């Protein structure tokens, strides 16, 4: 770890300092006006954020989505005013009235930064540590994108080279997800990642001595990061010169991510509130805000005071952005001229289009043969990988079980890794046993853009990922989770590994599409539909979770209506259906066998396979009624999990064959038999439903 003296080339004027203090005043006033929020960190971090946005980062405030920009992630999302004040000062589109409406209905400045809501916000943060993992994912995506389009360029010479900056607080680094992601970043030697730690020693319960005593800098050194600690000024304020020097030094270290520890005083320079936990999540109070303004030379009677000189000075970021962009555009055009085929491929990817003929590469599976849907998914991924180069991903150390290896000869690993398949631009990601970080890194990869990401683990371990999965839905991100071993059918590993509540729980997340295909051909159609929904023509992206079997299941004729989420797999014979059997995944073949028994008894029975409730609900009412006729009240839903999903579909006369308790350690076939997932039990439930419907 280095602690460098300040020998900076930073140009820092009185107007720069006044702009920093203006950001502090705006943060204090915004929280005071609404009566709640987090003023302290936004006040103390103002010099660091200002230095990044005004002196360091390559960005164009006139076009926040410029592909050549550096990325900024505020992992400490509660300190959203740290970001909002800089977006306002730099001219990203926020105005003073937006800061005045902080945390109010319909404003552009919600309590925590929200991707897609506020221009210039790169990711939704708030749950602590998520942003750290998002930033790691962005840095990974930048490297993979470079490998797709400009792998031969010298370090720092490609138009695809840029930095990812992240500000994290004490709470972020206490969360387990940041440990997982930071370990991954060090292992991957992500030299394009710079993490600035706001080391203010304050948490909600007081000094961080209440919960933390480790040496965080040594921890990051152990992860393989380049670590620097910058000292504050004698008065306790952050030193922009020292921060600038540390960032510039970090940018020169290309074989490791960089960690910069900034010792700060929360709510500096508030005379009474600084260095207190009260300043973390509460308004300072009118008297303290006024006193703070006096300390900095502002009129205590004015609110939201921004001088013309300050805003004129900070809005020069627009001119700087245009100049930086002009330099980049020249390099980008030279790359295009030198690489016309790659440029054409880049244009396709940037437009969100898929290669011509990609659908033809998806295999069709032979009927009758028992194939595990996880195995089918693996074959489909490899087929897609041959024609969709931007598709990449991996597993949380379960690749052989999840069947997620898209290319066995190409692992995403840094130069110098001893494994023979190691390639800095490889396609197969080894996320390690870090499920939570994997999901959040996938979010970062999707946010970065220009690649298509998937990641796998057992369905039961989706619990480890849940917060990041929820955020992927909140942000409408096109990520795909490959969750295998999706029921008691996994067998002997027992109830710790057998998902029971998971399907219903995941379906409860708004905007997440859970897809549980019945067989290999439904799996193929599901992958095709997922990729189709990733294209820009489809509109807003959505995350998908594939729930796949460990065990083999019968393969049926492919039916394109599987892409609608629910369809008639087998129609009733001998008249209109008296009962409809609805099933998903490995239970579909149980419903099919039950239909055969019912038909043999003269009961016309329809089987509906419903791989995705969410896709089905997106169809028009006419289609849904054609699959589940309102006139047929006798219905049975069959799924090896809790039955919460199915009450609305079966109605008062319906029955649900479900699993309302944990599983057990035994062969999967034995468990299906013991827990009632048999043709006989489903047929019996159907007869009960028919009787109930006739009452």
Residue ranges and their predicted role:
Residues 166-167, 195, 394, 516, ...:
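Residue-level marker for buried hydrophobic side chains located in beta-strands
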């Amino acid at each position: 770890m280095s602690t460098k003296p300040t020998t900076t080339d930073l140009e820092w004027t009185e107007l720069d300092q006044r702009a920093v203090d203006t950001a502090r005043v705006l943060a204090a006033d915004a929280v005071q006006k609404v009566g709640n929020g987090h003023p302290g960190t936004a006040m103390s971090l103002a010099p660091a954020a200002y230095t990044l946005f005004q002196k360091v980062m390559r960005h164009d405030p006139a076009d926040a989505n410029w592909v050549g920009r550096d990325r900024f992630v505020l992992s400490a999302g509660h300190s959203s005013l740290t970001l909002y004040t800089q977006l306002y000062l730099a001219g990203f589109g926020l105005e003073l009235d937006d800061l005045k409406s902080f945390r109010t209905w319909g404003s552009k400045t919600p309590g925590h930064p929200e991707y897609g809501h506020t221009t210039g916000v790169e990711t939704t943060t708030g749950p602590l540590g998520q942003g750290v993992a998002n930033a790691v994912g962005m840095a990974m995506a930048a490297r993979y994108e470079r490998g797709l389009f400009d792998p031969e360029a010298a370090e720092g010479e490609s138009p695809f080279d840029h930095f990812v900056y992240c500000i994290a607080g004490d709470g972020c680094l206490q969360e387990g997800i940041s440990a997982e992601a930071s370990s991954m970043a060090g292992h991957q030697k992500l030299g394009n990642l710079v993490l600035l730690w706001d080391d203010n020693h304050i948490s909600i319960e007081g000094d961080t001595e209440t919960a933390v005593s480790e040496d965080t800098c040594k921890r990051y050194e152990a992860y393989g990061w380049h670590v620097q600690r910058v000292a504050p000024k004698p008065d306790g304020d952050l030193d922009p010169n020292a921060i600038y020097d540390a960032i510039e030094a970090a940018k020169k270290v290309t074989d490791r991510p960089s960690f910069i520890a900034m010792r700060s005083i929360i709510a500096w320079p508030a005379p009474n509130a600084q260095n207190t936990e009260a300043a973390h999540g509460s308004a300072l109070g009118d008297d303290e805000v006024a006193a703070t303004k006096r300390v900095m030379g502002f009129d205590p009677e004015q609110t939201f005071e921004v001088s013309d000189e300050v805003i004129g000075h900070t809005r020069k970021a627009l001119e700087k952005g245009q100049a930086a962009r002009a330099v980049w555009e020249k390099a980008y055009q030279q790359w295009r001229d030198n690489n016309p085929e790659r440029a054409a491929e880049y244009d396709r990817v940037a437009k969100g289009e898929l290669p011509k003929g990609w659908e033809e590469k998806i295999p069709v599976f032979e009927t009758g043969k028992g194939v595990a849907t996880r195995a089918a998914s693996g074959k489909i991924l490899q087929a897609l990988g041959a024609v969709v180069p931007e598709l990449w991903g991996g597993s949380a150390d379960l690749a052989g079980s999840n069947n997620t290896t898209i290319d066995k000869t190409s692992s995403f690993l840094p130069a110098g890794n001893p494994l023979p398949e190691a390639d800095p631009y490889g396609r197969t990601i080894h996320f390690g046993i870090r499920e939570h970080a994997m999901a959040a890194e996938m979010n970062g990869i999707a946010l970065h853009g220009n690649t298509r990401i998937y990641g796998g683990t057992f369905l039961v371990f989706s619990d480890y990922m849940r917060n990041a999965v929820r955020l992927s839905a909140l942000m409408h991100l096109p990520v795909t989770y490959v969750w295998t071993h999706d029921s008691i059918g996994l067998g002997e590993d027992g109830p710790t590994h057998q998902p029971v509540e998971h399907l219903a729980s995941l379906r409860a997340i708004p905007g997440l599409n859970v897809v549980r295909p019945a067989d290999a051909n439904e799996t193929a159609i599901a992958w095709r539909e997922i990729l189709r929904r990733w294209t820009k023509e489809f509109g807003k992206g959505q995350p998908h979770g594939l729930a796949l079997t460990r065990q083999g299941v019968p393969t049926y004729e492919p039916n394109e209506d599987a892409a609608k989420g629910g369809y008639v797999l087998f129609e009733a014979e001998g008249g209109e259906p008296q009962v409809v059997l609805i099933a998903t995944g490995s239970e579909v073949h149980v419903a099919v066998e039950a239909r055969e028994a019912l038909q043999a008894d003269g009961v016309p029975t329809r089987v509906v396979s419903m791989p995705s409730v969410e896709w089905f609900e997106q169809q028009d009412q006419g289609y849904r009624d054609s699959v589940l006729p309102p006139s047929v009240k006798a219905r049975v839903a069959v799924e090896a999990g809790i039955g919460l999903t199915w009450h609305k579909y079966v109605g008062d006369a319906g029955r649900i064959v479900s699993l309302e308790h944990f599983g057990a350690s035994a062969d999967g076939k034995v468990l299906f038999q013991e827990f009632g997932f048999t043709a006989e039990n489903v047929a019996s439930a159907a007869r009960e439903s028919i009787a109930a419907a006739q009452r």
